[in-house]
């Protein structure tokens, strides 16, 4: 897909290696029983090494999250190592030592390769089943191999995006080429256990802009607040959620903060749309928009309440324009509202107004794959959109058998 907005090019055929100064790789290290790729590496060749990150708000944090939070206090990263096939969560002190050992192994391999690196410059990310220790013999052997396999260009980024997949059916990546001759790229994984506070989601973003860690942190937090934090597939918040942004400075260009913010936002928004489209068991993509709220915060709360409601999601799955479920859902949100003032629309067709259903509301066609639910509270200027999906038989079947 190619899109031109404000002369910037957004390309889904490219990812983390689109910006200058980055290499990546993805290999099969034997962590997954399937034999598919399960280990990815993203390497920043510099000359700058600024980095920022946001992590899960779940109080139960996986070992790699705890490790990566520590290393990011320096505001610099040379590499990110990511594995699928095991979350390394709820694994105690031994699990944290495994994360540390992984970073040490990456640092040693990169140093042997010719780039002096310390473990403090390596972030670690894991995704998969909670509760099991990682097969460290396979993982550490894979680290030694993957450093030798690093590539620039598109192939390395493609392989890395495939290696972080779990229940995903397709890799997710995108790059934005700014007309000012700098680029932002990214890859993400996630298909379930996705809720605000990020998602069961690993995401690595890269840029060749010459920007400091403070600017990166500002751009990343603004972007995630408006995108990943408003993606709610199943209301479940993972222990491993991680979004990292690395800057190589290889373009030599320092964009204005507003331009950096916009580019990172657009890349995150596109990745968010890809996550929504590939959610577990999804048959319909649903955007819930609340307008006219007393504040933007109230709008987010209301939209999220609707997006998480199982009865709303199952009605959408059945193509049932059941506006009563939407009204009931928003009615329990802890916000100000007047049911006699608010309106509800499905795909632009009004189905509820003045406290009652509208004529023809039950005939609105929801058979298509994209559904827009809009609730106007008519109280103020607050507005927010939350992405979600329907709740299908496929979702239940996939998650009931996940650990086996």
UniProtKB/Swiss-Prot annotation:
Statement: the UniProt record of this protein carries the keyword Cytoplasm: yes
Positions annotated as active site in the UniProt record: 200
Enzyme class: transferase
Pathways per UniProt: Amino-acid biosynthesis; L-arginine biosynthesis; L-ornithine and N-acetyl-L-glutamate from L-glutamate and N(2)-acetyl-L-ornithine (cyclic): step 1/1; Amino-acid biosynthesis; L-arginine biosynthesis; N(2)-acetyl-L-ornithine from L-glutamate: step 1/4
Alphabetized InterPro entries for the sequence: Arg_biosynth_ArgJ, ArgJ-like_dom_sf, ArgJ_beta_C
Keyword field contains Nucleotidyltransferase: no
Binding annotation for substrate: 166, 189, 200, 280, 399, 404
Keywords assigned: Acyltransferase, Amino-acid biosynthesis, Arginine biosynthesis, Autocatalytic cleavage, Cytoplasm, Multifunctional enzyme, Transferase
EC number(s) on file: 2.3.1.35, 2.3.1.1
GO MF entry, a single one: glutamate N-acetyltransferase activity
Assembly and oligomerization: Heterotetramer of two alpha and two beta chains.
NCBIfam families on file: ArgJ, PRK05388.1
Family: Belongs to the ArgJ family.
Protein name stated in the entry: Arginine biosynthesis bifunctional protein ArgJ
Gene from which this protein is expressed: argJ
